[in-house]
Amino acid sequence: GFISLAGAGRPAYDIIEEQLAGQPAEVQYLVKSINDSLKAGKEVSNIPMGLMALFRPSVQPYLISWYRYNPQEVIAKLRQPVLILQVSEEDAKLLEQSLPKAQFQILKDMNHVLKTCESVDMQVQQATYANPDLPVQEDLLITIEKFVKR
C-alpha cells in the first residue's frame, strides 16, 4: 500500500505562492517569476537575499523536480491501497477527490512535523519543531499500524 503522510494536495509552487501572498506585491511578483523559471526547468542565479532560504541555488534542482508533479494527478494513478493522513483539511479533500477509494483521515491537533500541537499560532508550532522530547502523535501511529496490518 501507499501512505500519504501530510502530503501536499496541490503543486508545490502554488503552496509557496500562497504562503507568501501576504508579502508586498514586488515580492509576490519575484516569487512568481522565480517559480515560472523553475517550472520551465531553468535555475535562477540572481535570487534576492530575502528569498534565499526558499530558492537558494542548492535547493533549485530539487524544486525543479518537485514542480513537475501535481499530487492529485499522481495519487489518482495509484492502484494499490492508499491511506491519506492529513493535517490540512483542504489538501486532504483534494487528494480524496483524486482517489475516492482511498482511506483518509484528518489527524486533529497534529502539525506537519507529526507532533501534537493544539495551537495554530506559528510561534507555538515552531516550538514543537525543535523539541526532541515531543513524540510523534499517537493517533498517527495507531492509524498507520491498522492500515499496514489489514
Give the ranges of each region predicted by the language model:
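Alpha/beta-hydrolase-fold catalytic nucleophile elbow
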Residues: 3-6, 85, 108
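Short beta-strand/loop motif that positions the catalytic acidic residue
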Residues: 78, 84-86
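Residue-level detector of structured alpha->beta connecting loops
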Residues: 79, 99-100
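Conserved alpha/beta-hydrolase "acid-adjacent" motif
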Residues: 87-93, 115
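Acidic beta-to-alpha connecting loop that harbors the catalytic carboxylate
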Residues: 89, 108-111
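Catalytic active-site module of serine/aspartate enzymes centered on a nucleophile-bearing elbow/loop
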Residues: 103, 110-150
